[in-house]
Amino acid sequence: MSKLFWAMLAFISRLPVPSRWSQGLDFEQYSRGIVMFPFIGLILGGVSGLIFILLQSWCGIPLAALFCILALALLTGGFHLDGLADTCDGIFSARRRERMLEIMRDSRLGTHGGLALIFVLLTKILVVSELALRGTPMLAALAAACAAGRGSAVLLMYRHRYAREEGLGNVFIGKVSGRQTCITLGLAVIVATVLLPGMQGLAAMVVTCAAIFILGQLLKRTLGGQTGDTLGAAIELGELIFLLALL
């Protein structure tokens, strides 16, 4: 199980993980690592939250919010943001399904993708600033949001089909069992409720799961399934929705 954790940490983040820690693990086994997603989100969000706390007293809330969101993007290598941009470029092209998938494969950033990145990043910065001004514990909020975003992404894997013939997302999409889905969501709920006591964390998690489930159904109808890009989009939007639900 520890090998799966290190493999998942290396897969969806840019944190330095020695290859020997996940040595002997086949790529086809990665689907079992989905249950680690909330814990990886907890780590990434915790680092981002610490950066916010350290910078808040020095440069103020707005700049601290800017740098903590920037740090989160750097910690993931922009992996999920790239998926968000590609998904928006494809979906909002209003083309046929096959053409949408082709556009999503294009490495060039389109207008819709650029606008999506600006909107999501700017909204995250504003929401983090507002939450901090309201006295929300930002270390807990950011850690819980990142855990919720990655945990809720399982809703685009379970009982969904892969929209392409090959790709990184094929490791997870359609390969996750009902038990793994329940465990992943359960762990995300536990993280959210422990970090944000009372109903606040639980309510935000419920809102996030509902929104990501609806997103998954809309993408399924439009693209005929999911891709690695749509998983990245779900993670980014899940984080944002969770933070918005805390307001």
From Swiss-Prot:
EC number(s) stated in the UniProt entry for this protein:
2.7.8.26
Write out the entry's keywords from A to Z: Cell inner membrane, Cell membrane, Cobalamin biosynthesis, Magnesium, Membrane, Transferase, Transmembrane, Transmembrane helix
Where does it reside?
Answer: Cell inner membrane
Q: Where are the transmembrane segments?
A: 34-54, 59-79, 113-133, 138-158, 187-207
Q: Which Pfam families match?
A: CobS
- Show the InterPro entries listed in the entry: CobS
Q: Which GO terms describe its molecular function?
A: adenosylcobinamide-GDP ribazoletransferase activity; cobalamin 5'-phosphate synthase activity
> What is the reaction catalyzed?
alpha-ribazole + adenosylcob(III)inamide-GDP = adenosylcob(III)alamin + GMP + H(+); alpha-ribazole 5'-phosphate + adenosylcob(III)inamide-GDP = adenosylcob(III)alamin 5'-phosphate + GMP + H(+)
- Cofactor(s) for this UniProt protein: Mg(2+)
Q: Which GO terms describe its cellular component?
A: plasma membrane
The topology of this chain with respect to the membrane is: Multi-pass membrane protein
Q: What is its main location?
A: membrane
Q: In which pathway does it act?
A: Cofactor biosynthesis; adenosylcobalamin biosynthesis; adenosylcobalamin from cob(II)yrinate a,c-diamide: step 7/7
Q: What does this protein do?
A: Joins adenosylcobinamide-GDP and alpha-ribazole to generate adenosylcobalamin (Ado-cobalamin). Also synthesizes adenosylcobalamin 5'-phosphate from adenosylcobinamide-GDP and alpha-ribazole 5'-phosphate.
The record's annotation in PANTHER family points to: ADENOSYLCOBINAMIDE-GDP RIBAZOLETRANSFERASE
The record, for HAMAP family, names: CobS (MF_00719)
Q: What is this protein called?
A: Adenosylcobinamide-GDP ribazoletransferase
